[in-house]
Amino acid sequence: MKRLLLIAVVALSGCSTIMEQIPSRWDANQSIIVTDMQQMTRHIDCTADLKPQLHDLFTKVEWYDIYATTKGTHDMAKLDQVMLTTIKEFQDRASAGPISPMYCDMKKKILIQQADIIAQTVQGRF
């Protein structure tokens, strides 16, 4: 009986590690939100007030994170953490005072790149 229990424990723990390696399936809701994220990053206007723009973008990315985590697609949830950090740093800098156009443009390009990577990963699933 102890052998059977040991075999069952090993088999079940092996299955759980295999399941972590299998990518999650395509999801229409995630595809919509990542397209919104791409669009929002492309439309950041460095000449306008950045706080509301960054707040809206942060809210979208946070929605994606909550949805992916709640749904259990942890492979997709890991993707947004870097983008959330970038947005938070950008928000903190915008709150501290005026931002140079070059800094804003560089952060915008980074956010566009991060949104594109997330979108390609999310929409490239089947």
Could you describe each region identified by the protein language model?
Residues 8-9, 39, 97:
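Residue-level signal for mature regions of secreted extracellular proteins and peptides
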Residues 11-32:
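Bacterial Sec signal peptide processing site at the extreme N-terminus
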Residues 22-29, 46-53, 75, 96-103, ...:
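Non-transmembrane, amphipathic alpha-helical segments
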Residues 33-66, 121:
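Post-signal-peptide N-terminal segment of Sec-exported extracytoplasmic proteins
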Residues 60-105:
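Long, amphipathic, charge-rich alpha-helical segments that form helical bundles/coiled-coils
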